[in-house]
Curated annotation (Swiss-Prot), chain A:
WD repeats lie at residues 23-64, 65-104, 153-192, 196-235, 248-288, 292-330. Disruption phenotype: Strongly reduced di- and trimethylation at 'Lys-4' of histone H3 in embryos and adult germline stem cells. Mutants also display defects in egg laying and fertility with defective germ cell development. RNAi-mediated knockdown disrupts development of the ASE left (ASEL) neuron, causing it to adopt the ASE right (ASER) cell fate. It comes from the Eukaryota. PANTHER family: RETINOBLASTOMA-BINDING PROTEIN 5. Disulfide bonds: none annotated. InterPro entries: RBBP5/Swd1 (IPR037850), WD40/YVTN_repeat-like_dom_sf (IPR015943), WD40_repeat_dom_sf (IPR036322), WD40_rpt (IPR001680). One of its GO terms (cellular component) is nucleus. It comes from Caenorhabditis elegans. Required for di- and trimethylation at 'Lys-4' of histone H3. Regulates left/right asymmetry of ASE sensory neurons, via its role as a component of the SET2 complex. This is Retinoblastoma-binding protein homolog 5. It is found in: Nucleus.
UniProtKB/Swiss-Prot annotation, chain B:
The keyword Transport does not apply. Keywords: Repeat, WD repeat. PANTHER family: WD REPEAT DOMAIN 5B (PTHR22847:SF637), WD40 REPEAT PROTEIN (PTHR22847). This is WD repeat-containing protein wdr-5.3. InterPro entries: G-protein_beta_WD-40_rep, WD40/YVTN_repeat-like_dom_sf, WD40_repeat_CS, WD40_repeat_dom_sf, WD40_rpt. The gene is wdr-5.3. Residues 22-35, 167-177 have a biased composition (Polar residues). Pfam families: Beta-prop_WDR5. It comes from Caenorhabditis elegans.
Length: 454, 501
């Protein structure tokens, strides 16, 4: 969609509060977009999970997943499965289209994080309170513990964990500011390093399209690293490639998210309903979005393809969007909006009565048009995968009827309770009172509304 | 009261007789003012006085009516108590003005009887209908301009560009009414112009379906390929089984002709646009009308489901695009999109972008989520655009113009890439479509009864299908098989199925 525009209008980050999602008396605790941003899952404090069609903002599915607050949500790559983790010591996997429960695994402690393997929906990484992260395989059922066998820090526990963009590595953050990188297949530690702090790493974020990983540390600094740089480390201290923090208030960050390109970083403050947006590579603060006072933020999510942010505070899901800037150039071609006065230099033949080069221009134009190969069928992989370097483009091609490929939308059932009984009337009545509403005239004249004969 | 009135009138009569000319002007202006300014409550009083005044002409009241009007235009200091005096007798003054107007009413007796039937017609309906009845009545009044109840799409563009429905346009006299050939294999003409029997790789007529009693305005295969839907000016949508082209169901709930309809992605529902300013949702299997969406103020000319089948976009002669929520039936968006009636609306393959075309010669591309305009496509000829649709991958736009040309646009560059000519399209809004099984073709009907097949890449006419005797508006190609369906205008009214060998 962006490619159709000649240039971008308005900011590429959210600027104002637009609306709240209708939770129907539920209290939200966390939320997660699917790969395309067409469906959003909201986990509630009563253990339910609401699936929204993000285009119409309607609830498409409701899962009674848990009996305690949902702590984390994760979508599978094709969007057909949803993984939920909860404070009731269990994780659950649902088939989103069918609305059925596929797996439930119970643990001994509260589960704070669960994440699908980016390429394999039969695997997930699970993090429990005060325990080492485990890699779970659902079918057949296998559980493997990620051991911390680095020298001198065997007793440190992981405080956060994440797969990298393609599921090749697992990145774990410890309570003392260390990063451990495991091979996702062999589950052996291949690299480890230190940040320039010994405080706990609270969160690891991996943008969809970039080569970076972002850490949210308890020292209130958000650091950006390049994954390739970390793979060569053996315990050294690594300086962050970029870092952002709140210079004024020294706010702590409850949650951090980025857009899919990794150009912007958004931090959710722990003390106020405030969202800070920085430009990632320059570290400059470009926007602070203020919500209601006194509300504490719980979660924040950036839309995969649009400048939209969902934030959860006080059980309410708020939606922040771009300020609407009217693109007047779109209504008339060759009309261009100017930011300031420009000196106009007319073209060579612009005001000539006769265009001497008209024939040549038309000839060259038609030749250019002839050479183009018109492909009306194939969709480019980046249009439906949001990435251009995927290796399974054919499998992930979306189908209109959802029989194959990813679940890129949820079919909407018609609300039959509100369907009106617009029945057919006798021909004589309809022909006679075409100007009026037939039902009322028929009622007034005492005719019965006969159902359709066929 | 009466003696006092007489006393007050008689002494004023004497001093104001010498000035007759200003009296007439002031009298006329006062009558106009009183007619305009009197509210409804006083109209009853005036009417009562009117009847009372009728009985007094023999007494010579017209003579005495002139003196009291003389008093009002004089703002003298002694006139101030006269004004206060006049306010007290305001009804009396009105009463004395009515006799002056009596000759007019006597001269024009027909107007009063003309108003009575209007009240009789409106008030009983008002009592029967809900408070919101009147806007719908206005909508019905708009439909009244189309007494023949023919779908607006099946009328030529010359008479349909205005917001008010025109009279029926005369059909082209050059059309010769010939009975359809009995031979099931109709003769086909190749690009060389030589009539010959169909060869391998060419389309041939396999079936002729009768079922509609008026012009076929729209034909669409369902996305799964099992059903064929045909909409007509006879207010019905018929659904056919594509395996053997047998009848399946009739969807009949519209009050006026069908202009367009759209299948949902699961081929279970049909959304239809009609002249009766409503958009309806039908269940295809049961034929029941599940929902009626009201909001358009003029003919609804086109409608389309989005690929997710969660929204329905409709547009028409009120120059607005309305987006309806499929689940609830509510109008979630209303976009004033063009400056002339909108002729077509189409979503791209992922539902993020929408394209509309209009008689104003513009094709506009919209962001479906926010409703903002992304781009406007205009060519140098500014011909009215009657149809627009995205290519299956959403990368190109195919449009039909009223200058007998089809164009393939690159919306990114905002310019046409290819032109397809050879058919005739001057009056009607034809449908065009891309056929992708076994080669990429563009298929369109023509106003001379032919159906043309172009190659997308080379722009050459691959085949011309002949068999219809009237203009062919509706054509569609099967999503997976090499089948084309076409429908003709009156008096043809049949659906022809063509299959490639």
């Amino acid at each position: 969609m962006v490619e159709i525009l000649d240039r971008t209008y308005g900011a590429q980050f959210p600027e104002e509060l637009e609306c709240h999602l209708d939770l129907q008396n539920a209290s939200a605790n966390c939320c997660k977009f699917n790969r395309w941003g067409s469906i959003v899952a909201v986990g509630c404090t009563d253990g339910r999970v609401l699936i929204y069609d993000f285009m119409t903002r309607n609830i498409a599915r409701t899962f009674s997943a848990h009996c305690l607050p949902v702590s984390c949500l994760s979508w599978s790559r094709d969007g057909r499965k949803l993984l939920t983790s909860s404070a009731d010591n269990s994780i659950a996997m649902f088939d989103v289209l069918a609305g059925t429960l596929l797996h439930r695994i119970r643990f001994n402690s509260m589960v704070t994080f669960a994440m699908f393997h980016p390429r394999n929906d039969n695997k997930a990484i699970v993090l429990q309170v005060n325990k080492q992260p485990t890699v779970e395989q659902f079918s057949p059922r296998i559980q493997t513990v990620l051991a911390n066998d680095t020298p001198g820090s065997s007793d440190e526990s992981a405080s956060c964990v994440s797969y990298d963009r393609k599921g090749k590595y697992i990145i774990a953050g410890t309570g003392k500011g260390k990063l451990l990188i495991y091979n996702a297949e062999t589950l052996k530690c291949v690299a480890w390093c230190k940040q320039n702090t010994v405080q706990q790493i609270r969160q690891i974020i991996v943008p969809m399209k970039s080569r970076f990983i972002i850490t949210n540390t308890q020292d209130r600094v958000i650091r950006t690293y390049e994954l390739e740089d970390l793979l060569h480390q053996r315990g050294q201290m690594v300086e962050a490639k970029y870092k952002v923090l709140d210079m004024v208030n020294k706010a702590a960050w409850k949650n951090v998210c980025t857009d899919s390109d990794g150009l912007y970083v958004c931090g959710a403050s722990t003390k106020a309903h405030s969202l800070y947006i920085w430009e990632s590579n320059t570290g400059s603060l470009i926007k602070i979005l203020h919500g209601n006072k006194g509300e504490a933020l719980l979660d924040v999510q950036w839309h995969p393809t649009r400048p939209i942010i969902l934030s959860i505070a006080q059980g309410t899901v708020s939606m922040w969007t771009q300020a609407h800037v009217e693109n007047w150039s779109a209504f008339a071609p060759e009309f261009q909006e100017l930011e300031e006065n420009e000196k106009y230099i007319e073209k060579e033949n612009e005001f000539d009565m006769e265009d001497e080069d008209a024939d040549e221009d038309m000839t060259s134009k038609s030749q250019d048009a002839e050479d183009d190969i018109i492909d009306v069928v194939n969709v480019r992989p980046e249009d439906y995968l949001a990435s251009s370097d995927e290796e399974d483009c054919n499998i992930m091609k979306p189908a209109r009827n959802l029989e194959s490929g990813p679940l890129w939308y949820i079919p909407v059932p018609l609300d039959i309770e509100n369907a009106d009984n617009d029945q057919r009337l006798p021909d004589d009545i309809r022909n006679l009172d075409n100007l009026l509403n037939p039902a009322w005239v028929a009622s007034a004249k005492g005719y019965e509304l006969s159902p359709k004969s066929k | 009261m009466n003696p006092e009135r007489q006393e007050t009138i008689s002494p004023k009569n004497v001093p104001f007789q010498p000035v007759p000319t200003p009296n007439q002007q002031s009298l006329q202006s006062r009558m106009l003012e009183s007619n305009q300014a009197v509210p409804d409550a006083f109209q009853k009083v005036a009417a009562w006085n009117h009847y009372n005044a009728v009985a007094t002409p023999p007494i010579g009241v017209p003579q005495t009516a002139r003196p009291p009007s003389n008093q009002s235009p004089h703002p003298n200091p002694p006139g101030y108590p006269y004004q206060s005096h006049q306010q007290q007798f305001h009804p009396l003054a009105i009463a004395f003005q009515q006799p002056f107007g009596l000759p007019q009413q006597v001269i024009y007796p027909p107007p009063p009887p003309g108003f009575t039937p209007h009240r009789v017609q409106v008030s009983p309906v008002g009592l029967l209908g809900p408070p919101g009845f009147f806007p719908q009545f206005a909508g019905s009044t708009t439909s009244q301009g189309n007494p023949s109840e023919v779908s607006v799409r099946t009328k030529s563009a010359e008479g349909t560009t205005g917001p008010i429905a025109p009279s029926i346009t005369t059909k082209p006299t050059s059309t010769i009414q010939v009975a359809p050939p009995r031979d099931p294999v109709a003769p086909t003409t190749s690009s060389s112009g030589i009539t010959k029997k169909p060869e391998n790789g060419e389309f041939s007529l396999v079936k002729t379906i009768s079922g509609h009693t008026k012009s076929v305005s729209v034909i669409k295969f369902s996305y799964c390929g099992k059903y064929l839907g045909t909409g007509s000016a006879d207010k019905q949508i018929k659904v056919w089984n594509t395996v053997d082209m047998t009848y399946l169901q009739t969807l009949a709930s519209h009050q006026l002709g069908i202009n367009d309809f759209s299948w949902s992605s699961n081929s279970q529902f049909i959304a239809s646009a009609s002249d009766d300013t409503t958009v309806k949702i039908f269940d295809v299997i049961s034929g029941a009308c599940l929902r009626t969406m009201r909001g358009h103020t003029n003919y609804v000319f086109c409608c389309s489901f989005n690929p997710q089948s969660s929204l329905i976009a409709s547009a028409g002669f009120d120059e607005t695009v309305r987006v309806w929520d499929f689940k609830t039936g509510l109008c979630v968006k209303c976009i004033p999109a063009h400056s002339d009636p909108i002729t077509s609306i189409s979503y791209n393959h992922d539902g993020n972008t929408m394209a509309t075309s209009s008689y104003d010669g513009c094709i506009r591309v919209w962001d479906a989520a926010s409703g903002s305009c992304l781009k406007t496509l205009v060519d140098t000829d500014h011909a009215p655009v009657t149809f627009v649709c995205f290519s299956p991958n959403g990368k190109y736009l195919l449009s039909a113009q009223l200058d007998s040309s089809l164009k393939l646009w690159d919306p990114k560059k905002a310019k046409p890439l290819k032109y397809y000519n050879g058919h005739k399209n001057k009056k009607y809004c034809l449908f065009a479509n891309m056929s992708v099984p076994l080669g990429k073709h563009i298929i369109s009907g023509s106003e001379d009864g032919r159906i043309l097949v172009w190659s997308i890449q080379t722009k050459q006419i691959v085949q011309i299908l002949e068999g219809h005797t009237t203009p062919v508006l509706a054509t569609d190609s099967h999503p997976t098989l090499n089948i084309i369906a076409s429908g003709g205008l009156e008096p043809d009214n049949v659906i022809r199925i063509w299959r490639r060998n």
